Amino acid sequence: MSFNLADTIRTARLQLLADAMSGGTLTLYTAPRPAIGAAITTQTALVEVAIPAGLTASAATLTLSLATSTVLVEDEAVWGRITSSTDEFVADGDCGLLASSAIFKLKTTYLAAGANLIPIIASFSEP
C-alpha cells in the first residue's frame, strides 16, 4: 500500500510539531530511555537547551540548530526529550554523532561537565 500527501499537507503537519516545541526545551539524558512521554526516573539530565520561539517548517522539513549550552553533568548522552514552553511532553529522540541517523546529532555523545556543548542539530521531515 502506498499513500502520498501533498507537500503543503506534509509541511503543515511539521508546522504542528514546530508550534509545539517553539519556546520549549531540549534536555539530553543518560540511559535508559523511558516509554514515550513517561516520567523521568533514574535518568540523569546532562544539559538543557532552549528552543527558540517562532519555528517554521518549510518544504516538509523542520531543522533546529540550537545555541551553545553548558553541560551540567558528565556522562553519555543517549536520548533527548523536547518539552513545550509550558513544560508539556512533545517528543523523545535518540542522540548520535553528526554522521549518524539519530534525531539529535552531536560532535560527541560523551559530555563533560562545565564544557560548552557546541550547537545541536536536529532535523525532522515528512516522507
Model-flagged regions — what are they?
Residues M1-V78, S84-P127:
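Small cysteine-rich, disulfide-bonded extracellular modules of the LU/uPAR three-finger superfamily
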